[in-house]
Amino acid sequence: MDAARNGALGSVESLPDRKVYMDYNATTPLEPEVIQAVTEAMKEAWGNPSSSYVSGRKAKDIINAARASLAKMIGGKPQDIIFTSGGTESNNLVIHSMVRCFHEQQTLKGNMVDQHSPEEGTRPHFITCTVEHDSIRLPLEHLVENQMAEVTFVPVSKVNGQAEVEDILAAVRPTTCLVTIMLANNETGVIMPVSEISRRIKALNQIRAASGLPRVLVHTDAAQALGKRRVDVEDLGVDFLTIVGHKFYGPRIGALYVRGVGKLTPLYPMLFGGGQERNFRPGTENTPMIAGLGKAADLVSENCETYEAHMRDIRDYLEERLEAEFGKRIHLNSRFPGVERLPNTCNFSIQGSQLQGYTVLAQCRTLLASVGASCHSNHEDRPSPVLLSCGIPVDVARNAVRLSVGRGTTRADVDLIVQDLKQAVAQLEGRL
């Protein structure tokens, strides 16, 4: 690993203190190749992609190449990729589209949907789970508050941290339009059974069609999984998949995969303007960031197994060192028996009345990390709702720290941060 890469992706050396970043589930730095792609596009492809002169054509070519790169990364078709500003927009676009689709179907069928009650039958029904990202949870809660939708939040299992397939199937109603379940949880790393959910929903749709009921579509937010494990839309069987660049060493834009966009799978724009992205997401394209996203996707396609193996080795070593240093005081919150999880994620608590996660991190001199999802950082003194949903006791969840390693994290980094945690605990317990 060359010096530039190690500086960007591993531990960070600065005077007078050395810092070790272990919050790669929150965001990642840009790979050097990504920075190069972005800067080259800024210099050479600054033209409007809708224009016919050289810099415009070059910009359009870069966008088309990036679209193909993203499609290759997820095993999809280039024409099914829509560029967006990021994961939040992609997730909102899916939810918005399903509300629109439901009402159009209602109009076409003369509101003949079989229903539990007149009020319920006029609203689309969504199914999700209790550990989703805020960009899924909050739009759905907003729809409920404004009486625009019905939502079932399926609890995850307290045994394995997963959304159970049978619970999701049991929640389906005649008015259900979408099941949205994340591919991997950002706090525990637990992989959700999305492939099985899609398979079962597809079988259910055949029965629904015979009864004149609309299809239930499946969406997964793959933000945390991309770049850490192979993601294939054919294996997953999903209709929508959210892509977030800054989680896999790309820029802070994103994309949405839509299977047979506008034909097999409905998509309705939230914005109206110049007609870019086939009118699904208008606005002059951000060519440099799209170039960087395409390069980040290329790197994942070429190196995913190598990245995954390295991160798993470092994460496993981290957990071994934590157990060796803290013994029975350590509780590994992200280890569930028989359940697959992300290779880079370690959520743990050090048990002790003074060892709340945010307090421990505040005493650390080397470690840069968080107690959980970065979007909840203003509530760091509260136990994580995700951990509580997974059956972690309140006193344990309150002490939680989430460490997520990256492509350049080393065993030496792990040794440093374990010693840092040791001194932080000693400080808090008055032993220093």
Curated annotation (Swiss-Prot):
Tissue note: Widely expressed. Present in liver, kidney, testis (at protein level).
Pfam families the record matches: Aminotran_5 (PF00266)
One BP annotation, GO: response to insulin
Protein's recorded name: Selenocysteine lyase
PTM-bearing positions, type Phosphoserine: 117
EC number(s) stated in the UniProt entry for this protein: 4.4.1.16
One annotated GO molecular function: selenocysteine lyase activity
Catalytic activity: L-selenocysteine + AH2 = hydrogenselenide + L-alanine + A + H(+)
Keywords, sorted A to Z: Acetylation, Cytoplasm, Lyase, Phosphoprotein, Pyridoxal phosphate, Transferase
Known function: Catalyzes the decomposition of L-selenocysteine to L-alanine and elemental selenium.
SUPFAM superfamilies linked: PLP-dependent transferases
GO cellular component: cytosol
Record note on quaternary structure: Homodimer.
Major site of localization recorded for this protein: cytoplasm
Compartments where located: Cytoplasm, Cytosol
